[in-house]
Amino acid sequence: MAKCLIVYASKYGSTKEVAQAVADGLGADIASAAVDPDVRPYDLVVIGSPIYGGDYLEPIKDFLRANKPYLAKRKVAAFITAAAHWQRDVGLTGEEDELLFTQQDYADGLAKLAGGDCMDCRGFGGRLVPQDLDDADRGMLEWFYRFLMHEPLQGFDLLDLPSAYRWGEELRETLAG
């Protein structure tokens, strides 16, 4: 049986919940990127990060930089969570010719940063509780929703933990091959 590890960064808890659901479905160990877990005993490392301000959290980027040589020798998978319910591509200016990003684009990008032999990557919805946000995140998300999503900032819960669990099961089945 392959040994698997989920490494995640989470700011408000949604990504941690998704990471736990994937770990449960996969039968994997789980660790925060902030503790810099040792990936060497593992055959598969799944990386997870939320998207904030169009980027991954620093702890996951730091983890990936520090472990690049080890990850290059392993199977990897990646997932992101996003506090946006994207029904369409999202860009920064609204111009037709600009580069647009979807949840899947961000998940693919995280997998590329991880290196290694990528098995799969996924984008999952997140949870947004406006009253829990710090001032910087509230300001950034109010701008994002007003100018890019063309709607007011509202709370929502798009976590789909059963889908995250099923994805973990799919990864396990693929590994068992």
Where are these regions (language model features)?
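FMN-binding flavodoxin-like domain, especially the glycine-rich phosphate-binding loop
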Residues: G25-D29, L44, Y52-G177
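The conserved SAM/SAH-binding core of class I Rossmann-like methyltransferase domains
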Residues: V7, A31-A33, F79
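Short, charge-patterned binding micro-sites
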Residues: G48
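Short acidic low-complexity segments
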Residues: D29-R40
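Generic anion/oxyanion-binding catalytic loop in active/binding sites
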Residues: C4, A34, L153
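N-terminal beta1-alpha1 ligand-phosphate binding loop
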Residues: A2-L26
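Gly/Ser/Thr-rich loops at beta-strand to alpha-helix junctions
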Residues: K11-G13, I51-G54
